[in-house]
């Protein structure tokens, strides 16, 4: 289905009952073709979604609440358009279910069908809420650098290396901003870049991250673009790119891409999330 058919950017009625057909998948292939990724992917990855506004009715009609974390593999053929995801979750608000496990089973089944691959989830009931914590991304903070910036569309030519030796380091910035390709709404994120290879020029990397400021692309696509541009410019032996975007409509999206053979990171919310 074309993106113009998605609920994003349109006025739509909020559903009054459960409806899995509300989920709107978007193929990853078109964006990846634009990055030259038409064969085996150069990374592993996961899109970590967090749902903060999840509610349903129990068998007696009493509201129940929970939070949930979903992990959609980057190898899946589809992403799920975020407004359709929100509408789908809201369709449970007036739906009676016998127990929380029934809801969990429906979520896993429906989201896996939309993504085209198994979706893992962590179902967080209120008794676990006080175990959740906030933790900022680790790494050397690039935002302290004094740089002059005049590029606000992705400029991979800003990327480069400063030496020939091999190092391992982790860098981070809170200055990633992109925009929804349909509505133009700003998407705010912190991004972490861990690599093994020649030293990446830090000032150039910060200016490159800032250059996304007027760019219109979905969260997942931005992270894959950053990964591919860094691989092309610096050819690190290992590279991991992880972004944590602020929430919208009760959902946040946190794409992670890596060729380091590591497991996906723990889902630790940042202060702005």
Swiss-Prot record:
The keyword Oxidoreductase appears for this protein: yes
GO (cellular component) term, any one: cytoplasm
Keyword annotations from UniProtKB, A to Z: Cytoplasm, NADP, Oxidoreductase, Queuosine biosynthesis
Keyword match Aminoacyl-tRNA synthetase: no
Record Gene3D superfamilies: 3.30.1130.10
Enzyme class (EC, first level): oxidoreductase
Record-annotated active site: 180, 187
Leader peptide range in chain numbering: none
Free-text function comment from the UniProt entry: Catalyzes the NADPH-dependent reduction of 7-cyano-7-deazaguanine (preQ0) to 7-aminomethyl-7-deazaguanine (preQ1).
UniProt name for this protein: NADPH-dependent 7-cyano-7-deazaguanine reductase
């Amino acid at each position: 289905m074309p993106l113009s058919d998605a609920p994003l950017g349109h006025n739509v009625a909020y559903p009054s009952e459960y409806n899995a057909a509300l989920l709107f998948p978007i193929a990853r292939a078109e964006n990846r073709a634009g990055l030259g990724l038409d064969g085996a992917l150069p990374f592993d990855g996961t899109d970590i979604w967090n749902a903060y506004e999840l509610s349903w009715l129990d068998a007696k009609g009493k509201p129940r609440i929970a939070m949930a974390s979903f992990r959609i593999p980057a190898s899946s053929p589809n992403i799920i358009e975020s407004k359709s995801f929100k509408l789908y979750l809201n369709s449970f608000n007036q739906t009676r279910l016998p127990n929380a496990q029934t809801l969990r089973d429906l979520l896993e089944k429906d989201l896996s069908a939309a993504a085209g691959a198994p979706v893992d989830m962590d179902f967080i009931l209120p008794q676990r809420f006080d175990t959740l914590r906030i933790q900022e991304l680790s790494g050397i903070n690039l935002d302290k650098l004094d740089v002059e910036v005049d590029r606000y569309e992705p400029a991979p030519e800003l990327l480069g290396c400063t030496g020939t030796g091999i190092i391992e380091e982790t860098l981070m910035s809170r200055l990633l901003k992109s925009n929804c390709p349909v509505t133009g709404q700003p998407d705010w994120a912190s991004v972490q870049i861990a690599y093994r290879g020649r030293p990446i020029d830090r000032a150039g990397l910060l200016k490159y991250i800032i250059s996304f400021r007027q760019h219109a692309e979905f969260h997942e696509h931005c992270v894959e673009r950053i990964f591919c541009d860094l691989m092309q410019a610096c050819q690190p032996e290992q590279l991991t790119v992880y972004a944590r975007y602020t929430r919208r409509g009760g959902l946040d999206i946190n794409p992670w891409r890596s060729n380091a053979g590591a497991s996906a990171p723990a889902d630790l919310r940042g202060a702005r999330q």
